[in-house]
Structure formats: C-alpha cells, structure tokens
Swiss-Prot record:
GO terms for molecular function: rRNA binding; structural constituent of ribosome. It comes from Anaplasma marginale (strain St. Maries). It comes from the Bacteria. One of its GO terms (cellular component) is cytosolic small ribosomal subunit. One of the primary rRNA binding proteins, it binds specifically to the 5'-end of 16S ribosomal RNA. This is Small ribosomal subunit protein uS17. The gene is rpsQ.
Amino acid sequence: MMSKGVLVGVVTDARRDKTVKVSVYRMVHHKVYKKIVKKCRIYSVHDEHNRCKRGDVVKIREHIPVSATKRWIVVDS
C-alpha cells in the first residue's frame, strides 16, 4: 500500500526540459453498466535531472507548485 499523494505511472512524453508527462491508470466500477473501466489521467511532473525516458515506470509524489501546471515530482524512476 502506498502513502497518500504517491502514484505509479508510465512516462508518455519526455521531450521538454525537466518536465515529463506521466499517465496514471486506475480501475473504476461503472455505476450504470456494472463493469470495470480503465481510467487514465495525465500529469505534468517535474524531473530535475532529466533521468526519465518514454516508457519508464515511475513513482510520483505531490509537491508544492513548481510551475503553472506542475504539482508533482518524480520520486523513483
């Protein structure tokens, strides 16, 4: 079990300097159709040392705002 504010996702875009986009998938139960649905959310994440590459599985953590859209940082890559 992970602590609050820590997520695991896959790096989908690593073209910008010190910023990566991470897709976090979760399974939710659909109320109407009574089926399990896969939901995805994409986060802009601060990567201070540009270590992450596309396809890496990373652990991200909530952080104080680094920019207008970045409120997460890479913990483990």
